[in-house]
Structures are given as structure tokens and as C-alpha cells.
């Protein structure tokens, strides 16, 4: 299957540049994957739409203030995205994504606003062209990033981050730092909507998948079967595992909130034992049409970028024809797309 088959036309003005005025003030497109029927609703109506006996699973990873700026020796301002600390380092050695990467060669040094210094060094492991290994003269932790870093808004949002983004590019239930992009399906949810969902008798559980390169890097291969996902790390508690196993055994609907939750649950499910493996794990699962889902058959998600692994995942779940019909409808009805855009519920 060719990557270009997952391309679609999207007017620039439908790419949301800011969140809705109020969290949860978004539109909701419902897709019945069996019939292909579409229904235009509001996100605030979600609790009344969801099946009563469902289990909803959310990703509670918290977005790092991972975009940082520094000055080079020539006083040029340079931008980096802090991906993750290098394995076995004390927190002073990080894998970073460099803007204008060709200029950032080993030996180049940088100065940050608080006086922290860093140097690009040769990596002991192979890195792709835009990535670098950066050695700091101190431990870099989330406390430092909170103070000196910026929210890593995606490149299709053509503005600098603001104080509002520190709140709105984070879910209300985010708990554990580690993501370099928001698990965006969750951005719609307010505490009020979550309470209404619980009041309806729907169970809510959480997993933690730290959104990394696997989620947001483009599919560069001509054939999707040749695409390799970057590894992302996740955690499932014993409590969540037991709740998922119980729902599966009882034949209740399991609704994933976001594609990261889908990838987490599908990766951890042991079909033979009918068990969800719990604890710290990692995944490079790539879900595209022809994938047979083991656990998930319903999904709350956003509208995704053309030719992305995410639009391939939703096509695997609902059928490519259904998804592209829904996306054409969304364009015609002027739904907002991507991270700060409107939502979609696949039933």
C-alpha cells in the first residue's frame, strides 16, 4: 500500500492555530464504522452518546516544556527539541532534534539564558540526520525545562507559544512528565465532562505512553509497509490491566481516548492468555490497514495530518473509505483539524 494513498486536500484555514475559546467547546463528528453514517454533534454531548457499560482508557502522560533556545558563539539563536535523556546518563546527556541541523556539528557550544552551557558531541549510537547528542554542564530535569523551556507546539501552528498553551496544550488529567507532544484527543476533556461520564456508570482508567518520535514523525517510505516506527515507552498499572481484562471478558465496549492509548493497549494485550501485560514496557507497533485489532473497537480521536501513521491507524480501525468520507465531510463542514482542532468518535 502506498503512503500517497493517505493524502488528502486540506485548506490551510482549517488547521487550528489556537485552542477553542473554552476547553471542551469543540465540535464532534461521529462515525459509525459499520454503516459509514456520519453525525455532527458537540463535544459537550459526548457523555450522552457513549454506551453506558463502556470502559474508557486515557493517556495521562504530561507534555514537557521541551522546546529550548540557546545562543551559539556567534550569538545566533538556535532552537532544539529535547527528545529524551540518553540511556545510562545522569540527566546531563540528551538526544535533541536540532532546527537547521546541518549547522549543528559536534564541538559546537551553546549558552542558555540561565548560564547553562551545552555542547554537541559525537553520539555512541547512530542517530538520524536531524538528531544530535547534546552534553550539558548540569543535570537537565523537568523543573529546569518548566522554567526555561517552551511548549513544543507542532510546526503547523505558525506562532510562538504563550502562557495559555502551558494550560491548553496539556490534558486536565496529565500526571507524569515525558511527552514531547500532547496526546491531543485528551485536550477536549474537562473535569465536568469526566464527572458526567463517571455519573453515567462508565469506568475510566489511565495508561501512560510518553508521546515521542514514533507518534509524530512523518511516514517517509513510499510503501507504508517499509515504514519503521520509533520506539516509545509506556506504563500500565495492575489496576488498569485488571479493569481492561474484566471489560474484555464481559464483552463491554473498550473506548480508547487517542491513538497513543490504542497503540499502548494493542501492544500489551496477550491474545492467548487474554491478559493485559502491566508494568513498564515499550512499543514500536505500526497500525495500518490489514491490522487485526485484538482489544479496541471504539476510538475518540482528533483529525490527523495527511500521510501520517495516525491517519493510517484510524483507517485500519474504521476502514479507509469511511475515514476519507468522514474527512471530506469535515472539510466541507469546516471542522478544525489537528492538535487544537475538533474531535471525532469512531463507534
From Swiss-Prot:
Its EC number is 2.4.99.17. It is found in: Cytoplasm. It catalyses: 7-aminomethyl-7-carbaguanosine(34) in tRNA + S-adenosyl-L-methionine = epoxyqueuosine(34) in tRNA + adenine + L-methionine + 2 H(+). Keywords: Cytoplasm, Queuosine biosynthesis, S-adenosyl-L-methionine, Transferase. Pathway: tRNA modification; tRNA-queuosine biosynthesis. GO terms for biological process: queuosine biosynthetic process; tRNA wobble guanine modification. GO terms for cellular component: cytoplasm. InterPro entries: QueA, QueA_dom1, QueA_dom2, QueA_sf. The keyword Aminoacyl-tRNA synthetase does not apply. Disulfide bonds: none annotated. One of its GO terms (molecular function) is S-adenosylmethionine:tRNA ribosyltransferase-isomerase activity. NCBIfam families: PRK00147.1, queA. Monomer. Belongs to the QueA family. Transfers and isomerizes the ribose moiety from AdoMet to the 7-aminomethyl group of 7-deazaguanine (preQ1-tRNA) to give epoxyqueuosine (oQ-tRNA). This is S-adenosylmethionine:tRNA ribosyltransferase-isomerase. It comes from Treponema denticola (strain ATCC 35405 / DSM 14222 / CIP 103919 / JCM 8153 / KCTC 15104). The lineage of its organism: Bacteria, Pseudomonadati, Spirochaetota, Spirochaetia, Spirochaetales. The gene is queA.
